[in-house]
Amino acid sequence: MKKIIFCFLYLYTLNVFGASKIDHNKLNSCSITRNIFNNYEPKVFETTNNLLRKTGTLSKFYGEMILIRGKILDQNCVPVTDAKVYLWQAGNGGKYPYEPLKTRVDKSRFTNKSDSSFTGSGIATTNNKGEYYFISMLPYKSPRYLRNANIRIEHPNLTTLETRLDLFDKNMCDNECGEISPILIETKKNIPSYCFDLVLQGTTLKRY
């Protein structure tokens, strides 16, 4: 009887360690970024990643220039290439400088009478490393409205994500990362950067 019990425990131990080895070979798993929705997205997005001006015009804005950047990953931590990234935010005065998509919103949050070139919206496409970046400005801060931007990521193979980016000191980049336009770096030094790595539900790698 003791021999039978010993053999059973031995085989069970082999199965446990065998399963653990298989687990170690699995792809990494990233925590999926949660959705936080915003009702103030624009009716029409500007088609550039520079929110400080329209394409072909000079920039004239009132506030501090910043970079918003990071990586888009799938749930296996694989960088997502060619994802469409939409960003929108209020300007220095706390208002959105465009016409909203939705009609049942607080109209006092919008303005079309500013002499600033700040557009409040833009679009970027991730590179082959899953990286994106936007040129923007630090939004208005008050007891009622915190400094944040809104982002939506779309990819044909992944679940669309919409969330909020809190522009707090804790989210500032620790070091230089990602590919940024050399023209921007040459003309402006020490631009405050906020980094956000976002994870979408789904996988981009095909199984064969």
From Swiss-Prot:
Which enzyme class, named as a word?
oxidoreductase
Record key words, sorted: Dioxygenase, Oxidoreductase
Q: Which GO terms describe its molecular function?
A: ferric iron binding; oxidoreductase activity, acting on single donors with incorporation of molecular oxygen, incorporation of two atoms of oxygen
Task: Give the E.C. number(s).
Answer: 1.13.11.-
Q: Name one Pfam family in it.
A: Dioxygenase_C
Disulfide bridge positions per record: none
To which protein family does this belong? Belongs to the intradiol ring-cleavage dioxygenase family.
Name-wise, this protein is Putative dioxygenase RP396
> Which organism encodes this protein?
Rickettsia prowazekii (strain Madrid E)
